[in-house]
Amino acid sequence: MPPKFDPNEVKVVYLRCTGGEVGATSALAPKIGPLGLSPKKVGDDIAKATGDWKGLRITVKLTIQNRQAQIEVVPSASALIIKALKEPPRDRKKQKNIKHSGNITFDEIVNIARQMRHRSLARELSGTIKEILGTAQSVGCNVDGRHPHDIIDDINSGAVECPAS
């Protein structure tokens, strides 16, 4: 038997789920069942909290204390980029491995880099901006009508100025 669960203890559980959908509660059950929470209720709460990320795979952080779950959405860089593209949500089951052939501005890239700054491994914001540009390249979108890697080269050569913070 595992040790008895202390209700005042704060537990943090990370889950990957699709925005706006109630994931399989059977996947939630082994993680949050022992903590005294109903998987169905938590599944519904996650679906509510991730409503504006419809159709995107995102990480959700559950902070559990006193049998209460607080839900926090932790979006990845690619999820933020796809959201900035403002594409209509697509049906995930019909189309697989979608290339997002949109266009976003460099300012939006800088804003995303600021949001991701605390999770970045780069020392400066310019490094984080390059990380986000690399993700934009993987997603398949353009930045200001150009290929993201051309902008990374411009940042390295000094042709494009990055904000300091």
Swiss-Prot record:
Protein origin, superkingdom: Eukaryota
Ordered alphabetically, the record's keywords are: Acetylation, Cytoplasm, Isopeptide bond, Phosphoprotein, Ribonucleoprotein, Ribosomal protein, RNA-binding, Ubl conjugation
GO MF annotation, one: structural constituent of ribosome
- The covalent link annotated as Glycyl lysine isopeptide (Lys-Gly) (interchain with G-Cter in ubiquitin) occurs at K48, K83
One GO location term (cellular component): postsynapse
Membrane-crossing segments per the record = none
Pfam families assigned: Ribosomal_L11, Ribosomal_L11_N
Name the CDD domains on file.
Ribosomal_L11
Q: Which GO terms describe its biological process?
A: cytoplasmic translation; translation at postsynapse; translation at presynapse
Where it mainly occurs, coarsely classed, is cytoplasm
Q: Where in the cell is it found?
A: Cytoplasm
Q: Give residues where N6-acetyllysine occurs.
A: K54
Q: Which PROSITE patterns match?
A: RIBOSOMAL_L11
Task: State if Cytoplasm is listed as a keyword.
Answer: yes
On this chain, the residues bearing Phosphoserine are S38, S165
**Which SUPFAM superfamilies does this entry report, sorted A to Z?**
Ribosomal L11/L12e N-terminal domain (SSF54747), Ribosomal protein L11, C-terminal domain (SSF46906)
Against InterPro entries, the record matches this protein to: Ribosomal_uL11 (IPR000911), Ribosomal_uL11_C (IPR020783), Ribosomal_uL11_C_sf (IPR036769), Ribosomal_uL11_CS (IPR020785), Ribosomal_uL11_N (IPR020784), Ribosomal_uL11_N_sf (IPR036796)
Q: Where is this cross-link: Glycyl lysine isopeptide (Lys-Gly) (interchain with G-Cter in SUMO2)?
A: K40
Task: Spell out the post-translational modification annotation for this entry.
Answer: Ubiquitinated at Lys-48 and Lys-83 by RNF14 and RNF25 in response to ribosome collisions (ribosome stalling).
| Homology family | Belongs to the universal ribosomal protein uL11 family.
User: What does the subunit comment say?
Assistant: Component of the large ribosomal subunit. Mature ribosomes consist of a small (40S) and a large (60S) subunit. The 40S subunit contains about 33 different proteins and 1 molecule of RNA (18S). The 60S subunit contains about 49 different proteins and 3 molecules of RNA (28S, 5.8S and 5S).
Q: What does this protein do?
A: Component of the large ribosomal subunit. The ribosome is a large ribonucleoprotein complex responsible for the synthesis of proteins in the cell. Binds directly to 26S ribosomal RNA.
PANTHER family cross-referenced by the UniProt entry: 60S RIBOSOMAL PROTEIN L12 (PTHR11661), LARGE RIBOSOMAL SUBUNIT PROTEIN UL11 (PTHR11661:SF2)
* This protein's name: Large ribosomal subunit protein uL11
Q: What is this organism's lineage?
A: Eukaryota, Metazoa, Chordata, Craniata, Vertebrata
Please state the gene responsible for encoding this protein.
Answer: Rpl12
